[in-house]
A protein has these predicted regions:
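Pore-lining and gate-forming transmembrane alpha-helices of multi-pass membrane transport proteins
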Residues: 129-133, 203-224
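Juxtamembrane helix-boundary/capping and inter-helix hinge elements in multi-pass membrane proteins
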Residues: 30-32, 152-161, 196-202
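Alpha-helical transmembrane segments of helical membrane proteins, especially in multi-pass transport
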Residues: 138-148, 152, 161-193, 222
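N-terminal transmembrane hairpin
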Residues: 2-119
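Membrane-spanning helices that line or support transport/gating and their immediate boundary helices
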Residues: 37, 41, 142-149, 153, ...
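Membrane-proximal helix-loop-helix units in multi-pass membrane proteins
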Residues: 110-159
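Hydrophobic alpha-helical transmembrane segments of membrane transport and translocation systems
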Residues: 214-242
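Glycine-rich helix-loop "coupling/hinge" segments at transmembrane-helix boundaries
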Residues: 185-211, 215
Length: 242
C-alpha cells in the first residue's frame, strides 16, 4: 500500500471548522453560553499546536529521561483531573488516584511496549508517549466516573460494597460500548490513522486489538484499585450524609 501520508494544507484544514461553527451557532441561538465552547475550541488548538512542537523536540532528542519526565507529568495530570467529579478535596484522594493509575496504567503500558511490541530502545518516544497518553486518559475517565457514581450511591444510603460494584460497572460502560462497537460502528483512531498512512488493514487490526485490550485492562484495573483504596475516605463522607 502507499505509505505516503497526505499533507493537509491550512486552507483545507479550515474546512474542518464548518461543522464546529454550525454547533456554535446552535449553542448561541439556544442561549447555552457559547463562550465556554469557543474557549474550549481555542484551548484545543493551542494545546495541540504546543504538543506538536513538544513531540517534535522529544522525538529528535530521543532521550529516555525526557520520555520518563513527560510520562510522569501526564500521569500526575490525569490523576488530578480524574478527581474533579467528587466533592471531597482532591488532595485527600490524589495519592489514591496516582497509585491506581500506576498499578493499572503504567504496568499495562510496560506490558504492551516491552512485551507485545518489544520496543528497541525500550523508551521509544513515538510509541511510549502516544500509548501512555491513551492509557492514562482512559484511566482518568474510569476513575472519574467511578468516583462520581460511588459518591452518588453512598448519598442514597447504599452500603459501600454495593456502591463500589455499581461504581465499577458504571466506569466500564464507555469502554464496554467501545468493545461492542469497534469494527461495526466505528474504526478507532489508531486504526484509522494507520490505514490513512498506508499500513495494511490486517496489520492495523493487530495494533487496534492491542489498544483495545490495553484500554480495557488499564481502565478496569485503575478503577477497581481506586474504589478499593478510597473506602475509608468515602465511608467518612457517607457517615456525614446519614
Amino acid at each position: 500500500m502507499n505509505s505516503i501520508v497526505q499533507n493537509i494544507s491550512l486552507a483545507n484544514l479550515s474546512l474542518a471548522f464548518i461543522p464546529v461553527l454550525v454547533v456554535i451557532a446552535i449553542i448561541w441561538r439556544w442561549n447555552m453560553g457559547y463562550k465556554t465552547t469557543i474557549y474550549a475550541i481555542f484551548r484545543m488548538l493551542v494545546q495541540l499546536l504546543l504538543i506538536g512542537y513538544v513531540l517534535t523536540y522529544i522525538f529528535e532528542t530521543n532521550s529516555n529521561y525526557i520520555v520518563i519526565t513527560v510520562l510522569i507529568f501526564m500521569l500526575l495530570a490525569a490523576s488530578w483531573i480524574s478527581l474533579r467529579t467528587t466533592s471531597l478535596p482532591r488532595k485527600t484522594l490524589l495519592l489514591n488516584a496516582v497509585y491506581s493509575i500506576v498499578l493499572g496504567g503504567v504496568t499495562v503500558l510496560l506490558l504492551m511496549t516491552q512485551g507485545v511490541l518489544s520496543l528497541k530502545p525500550w523508551y521509544s518516544p513515538s510509541y511510549m508517549i502516544p500509548l501512555g497518553g491513551m492509557i492514562f486518559a482512559n484511566c482518568m475517565n474510569s476513575i472519574s466516573l467511578a468516583a462520581e457514581r460511588l459518591e452518588s450511591e453512598l448519598k442514597q444510603g447504599h452500603p459501600y460494597e454495593k456502591a463500589k460494584v455499581i461504581a465499577l460497572r458504571t466506569s466500564l460502560i464507555p469502554i464496554t460500548n467501545m468493545l461492542l462497537a469497534v469494527g461495526l460502528v466505528s474504526l478507532p483512531g489508531m486504526m484509522t490513522g494507520q490505514i490513512l498512512a498506508g499500513v495494511s488493514p490486517l496489520i492495523a487490526v493487530r495494533y487496534q486489538i492491542m489498544v483495545m485490550c490495553m484500554i480495557f485492562g488499564s481502565s478496569g484495573i485503575s478503577a477497581a484499585v481506586f474504589l478499593h483504596s478510597v473506602k475509608d475516605s468515602f465511608t467518612e463522607t457517607k457517615n456525614r450524609f446519614e
